[in-house]
Amino acid sequence: MPKAKFSLASREVKFKDQGRIEMARVFLSPPNMGGDELEYIKKVFESNYIAPLGEYVNRFEDAVKSYTGTRGALALNAGTAALHLALRCSGVKDGDVVLGSTFTFMASLNPIFYERCVPVLIDSDESWNLSPKLLKEAIKKSPKKPKVLVVTHLYGQAAKMDEICEICANEGIDVIEDAAEALGGFYKGKALGGIGKCGALSFNGNKIITTSGGGMLISNDEELVAKARFLSTQAREPLLHYEHKDYGYNYRLSNVLGAIGVGQMEVLPQRVKRKREIFKIYEDLFRGTDVEFMPEVEGGEGNRWLTTLLFKKKNAHLKVIDALNKADIESRPLWKPMHLQSIFAGALSVVDGTSEDMFERGICLPSGTDMSDETIERVVKIVKENI
C-alpha cells in the first residue's frame, strides 16, 4: 500500500507509489478546524450534555454577539431556520408580499413559501447584489404593499445597505439580511447581518466557519430574538407541564455543535484574513487578462467567502469548469437566478438581465482557507489555458 503524507496546513494528500504523486481533490470551500474544537467536544461528552442547548451553545451565541456587535443571537440548526424565524417574527401573514434578491441560493427564499407569502424577485446591479433602483420599481409594481425585503449579501460581499435601508424605511418595509455567506463581512463598520431588523448566518460545512450544519439569527431587537427562541423550541410555555398556545419548530442547535462553533469563532479573524488574501492572490495572478471580479461597494469590506469572476464570453466558464474538474479541482457556476427557476414561474420579477448575464459568464473558484499559494497558482494556470 502506498504511504500517505497528510499536510494539516493545506489538506493536500500526496500518495507516493512507484514515483507517482497524486494530489487530493481541491474543494471549493472545505471545513478548516482551528484546533480547540475536539477539546471542547470532549468536555461536552464528559458533561453528558449532548442534547440541544447547553453551556457551549450559550458561549457560541455570546461569541457571535461580541463579534457582530449585536444585542441578541440565537443558535439554530440551519441558516434557513434563522431566515424562517426572521420572517415569522416579522409578522407576515398568508398572501403578504415579500421582496427578495433573485441572484441568490434557493434557501434565501424558501421561507417565503413556508409562510405562504408572495415572492417578488429583484435583479442585481453592478455590485452583483440587489439593485436599489430596481427595488424602488419592484415596490411600485408589487400587487400589494410589501411587508419584508430579504436582501442577500452575495458571496460574502455587502449589498448597498444605506440606500436599501433608506428606501425600505420610507415604505415601512422590514429588512431581513441573508448573511449566510457573509459572517466576517462589514459595511461602514457594521457587521453584515446586524444592519437591518435582523440577519441570518449559516455554519454549513462550506461556510467561512462551520459547525457541520447550523445557523444563527442575530438582531439588535432583543424582543424579536426572544420570540424566535420561544418558537424554536416548539413554542413551549414556561410551565412545569407541556403547554402550547402557538405552534413552533424544532430548530435549536446541539451542545456538541455549539462546542465546534466556539472553537471556530476563535479563528474567524484569521479565516477572514486568509479569504481576502486568497482573493488578492487571484486578482494579482489574473492581472492583464480579460476577467472581471466581483467588486466591493463603497464602505464595504466583505469576507470574500468565494472568489468569483466573470469571463468576457458567454459560456466560457463551462470549458474552464470541465478542465478544472479533470484536474480534480472543484469550481462552480454562479447561482442560477431564482426568476429562471420553475418554482418561481408566474412570480413578479423586476429584472434587467444583469443576473442572467452573470450566470452565463461567471465562475466560483476554490477559496478554502487552507489552500496553499501554489494550489492557487495551479488553478489560475488551468483557467488561463482554457479561456
Predicted feature descriptions by range:
Residues 115, 170-171, 327:
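Helix C-cap/helix->beta junction micro-motif
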Residues 53-97, 111-115, 121, 190:
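Phosphate-binding glycine-rich loop
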Residues 104-109:
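Conserved coil-to-alpha-helix start sites within the AMP-binding
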Residues 5, 16, 58-62, 70-71, ...:
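PLP-dependent aminotransferase class I/II
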Residues 100, 118-127, 332:
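Short beta-strand->loop structural element characteristic of the AMP-binding/adenylate-forming
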Residues 127-211, 216-218, 223:
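Active-site phosphate-binding strand-loop segment of PLP-dependent enzymes
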Residues 2-51, 366:
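N-terminal "arm"/small-domain region of PLP-dependent enzymes with the aminotransferase-like
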